[in-house]
Amino acid sequence: VSGTLYGLGVGPGDPELLTLKAVRILRTVPVIAYPAPLEGDGLARRIVAAHLPGGQTEIVLRMAFDPTQPPPEAAYDRGAAEIAAQLDDGRDVAVLCEGDPLFFGSFAYVLERLAGRYPVRVVPGIASPMACAAALARPLSARDERLVIVPATRCEDDLAATLAQCEAAVVMKLGRHLAKVRRVLERLDLAAGAQIVAWASHAEQKIMTLDEAERDGVPYFSLVVTRRTSR
């Protein structure tokens, strides 16, 4: 009998934002797997460190993180093969994923390689837009407002066309795309209420206006939250 593949959402960064179910699985599963840079621990591993019992087998998917490039297929191929070997031996494997596993999550790349071959259980996690709304203490949307969540990596015209159809928006993966996103928000009358959250729920969390972000710069893990109207 093969093991079960778990996609484990570990939340946006604060270790106390893991679900009870995620913590239970972390403490009982014999194998964990997670993406990490070429050197050092990955973010997901750091988030769960305090909850790990020790003695588990750890599969590290080493890869160069470059948001301008496609996902590193070879790294995911190797990682999926290592995970499959553990599952074939009857050992459950929990793949750690920042935020929610199926919302812009790295677990999706493992899942597409192993789905259909093993039992799969996905444990949802708190995604970054929800953590940003909590940090700002403001609703993402209300009543019948249309909410759009879109990555800043889209081209400017596509962003404008998408955001023109909504009353509330979250723009993710901001980083070097700040100037482009600001132009679009100003064109669509969405800039006035915009706030930026970097590293939501982390110790280094920072909340900024567009002007402050343009002056100081923003990391890749930054989001813009805005609404056209308030109610």
Label every PLM stretch briefly.
Residues 39-41, 66, 127-131, 178-179, ...:
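Short gly/pro/ser/thr-enriched loop/turn and capping motifs at secondary-structure boundaries
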Residues 34-35, 60, 95-97, 122-125, ...:
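General beta-strand structural signal in soluble alpha/beta enzymes
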Residues 5, 88, 163-231:
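A contiguous loop/helix-start segment that scaffolds small-molecule binding in enzyme catalytic cores
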Residues 41, 77-80, 153-157, 178:
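Structural motif corresponding to alpha-helix initiation and N-cap regions
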Residues 21-23, 84, 137, 158-161, ...:
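A generic local secondary-structure boundary/capping motif
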